[in-house]
């Protein structure tokens, strides 16, 4: 199975048990709108933590009906985030979502050594894009968490992403390790990492996927381009997951797809005790809703 559009996420989670989603500092309009919609659709059972009066005012102004939804009043932002994380640490939630709070504040609590959501795995960002010019949904990692991942980090990032894709129904996801060129160049670290990751996959050191690289972006997403360059690959032109060389390339690609290609996107942080919806402030309510669906599908 592969996803043809982000709407397929709804089919994956529909009819299953509701996931308990905790919205940290819930006094944010777009986040509340997405959460209420997912609740009405039977996907989640939300707990809203934050300033109760602000939450209710936003809901009243936007006609969000939340009667029956649990609200925990905590006006202090840092305390609200801490309470949210502790609830999940105590097995009272399946998904954590960022509301009106800075990313650094949320991650500080997530990574707390005493009551945070550490598992020993690397945290990584995973995004799904629906682009009109590509025949299926394509995943991209890591565009927001790991600045300059080394080889060990990239192995962990691939494993996080492949595990998520398999929960979405993929059997053997095809992973393209991106570089500026498709030839190994000793002066370009990304190509060296790509070659090593490909060989490790061939030797079954990285499992449950097919990895090829280095591949330039055009080879990864266009079979015609790959054939023109004489590249023989199971991955080229049929990529399910693009592994970025670093955060700068990843972040530029992410925003280029959204703003230039008008791509639809859903994203999640993987590697913690539960999936974390950590969308950008510029993301639309629809993107937040799709990210909730993705996180619900990724939740164990």
What are these regions, as identified by a protein language model?
Residues 1-48, 52-235, 240-244, 249-300:
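Anion-binding alpha/beta catalytic cores of soluble intermediary-metabolism enzymes, centered on
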């Amino acid at each position: 199975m592969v996803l043809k559009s982000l709407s397929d996420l709804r089919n994956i989670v529909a009819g299953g048990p509701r996931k308990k989603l905790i919205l940290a500092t819930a006094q944010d309009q777009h986040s509340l709108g997405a959460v209420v919609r997912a609740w009405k659709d039977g996907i989640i059972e939300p707990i809203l933590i934050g300033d109760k009066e602000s939450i209710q005012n936003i809901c009243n102004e936007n006609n969000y009906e939340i009667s029956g939804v649990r609200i925990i009043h905590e006006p202090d932002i840092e305390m609200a985030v801490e309470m949210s994380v502790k609830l999940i640490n105590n097995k009272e939630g399946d998904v954590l979502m960022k509301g009106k709070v800075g990313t650094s504040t949320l991650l500080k609590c997530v990574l707390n050594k005493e009551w945070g959501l550490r598992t020993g795995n690397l945290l990584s960002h995973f995004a799904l894009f629906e682009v009109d010019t590509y025949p299926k949904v394509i995943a991209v990692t890591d565009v927001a968490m790991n600045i300059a991942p080394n080889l060990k980090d990239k192995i962990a990032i691939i494993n996080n992403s492949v595990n998520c894709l398999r929960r979405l129904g993929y059997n053997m996801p095809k992973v393209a390790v991106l570089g500026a060129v498709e030839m190994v160049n000793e002066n370009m670290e990304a190509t060296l990492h790509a070659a090593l990751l490909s060989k490790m996959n061939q030797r079954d050191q990285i499992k449950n996927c097919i990895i090829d690289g280095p591949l330039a972006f055009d080879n990864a997403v266009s079979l015609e381009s790959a054939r023109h360059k004489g590249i023989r690959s199971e991955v080229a032109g049929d990529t399910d997951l693009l592994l970025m060389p670093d955060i700068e390339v990843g972040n530029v690609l992410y925003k280029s797809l959204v703003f230039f290609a008008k791509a639809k996107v859903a994203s999640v942080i993987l590697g913690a005790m539960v999936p974390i919806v950590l969308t950008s402030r510029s993301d639309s309510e629809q993107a937040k809703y799709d990210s909730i669906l993705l996180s619900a599908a990724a939740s164990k």
